[in-house]
């Protein structure tokens, strides 16, 4: 059986090829990165040589798909028109730039409806996606499962399903399941991963599940908090991650660590989880 595909969030500050090299150094074969500065403004144009070098590294080291992350400040369903406008422009621009790195994922937080209500929120998110997605694109856009902090949309599988229902080019859409977020949203991912996956399948369809954010949580199930913890040191515990890296329905997906760590810490978590996955295969 193939090795798991796992990595962490990396900084773009030294360019794309540097992220690939750093990933290899810490034993990763995928990674996440922010597509632009979260403070807004224009994104740097991609340097074609830098991107080509990353693609070479990814091929040589047999990387799985990358899971790019839109900036947290991008809110397609804000109550402020300027914020919505920025989100729409940023997403469309990100998807055009992602074409330089075809075949990867672009994950984003559906948004916060800021007292407009979840129905209006979902409507705005769908409008934004329908503007940004284009026929023939080579990126799959992932909705992230959210903890349900404040007025976050995407706190339940039902809300994600309603967004997917409203997107015209939905063959370019999928879901990224964040283990900390679904726990905080009230799904017992630690106690009953199979039950949560069955529920996901019933409401959304497991064919939509494309990637995982692998995080422990500082808070109990249903707390709606969204505070990540190191693997095995939170309320989910190591057994939860043993299940994630060995379950046939999740072990083949790209897994991104967003735990509070430096690179050395990520390297340790990657080798820990690879070790567990390998021990079960044998
Ligand atoms: Fe996220
Ligand atoms: Fe996440
Ligand atoms: Zn989070």
What are these regions (language model features)?
Residues 23, 69, 87, 98, ...:
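Conserved, mostly hydrophobic/aromatic
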Residues 82-95, 118-131, 156-165, 193-198, ...:
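Short, electropositive alpha-helical surface patch
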Residues 21-27, 47-67, 92-102, 130-137, ...:
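Acidic (Asp/Glu)-rich catalytic clusters
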Residues 31, 126-229:
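Acidic/histidine-rich catalytic cores of soluble enzymes
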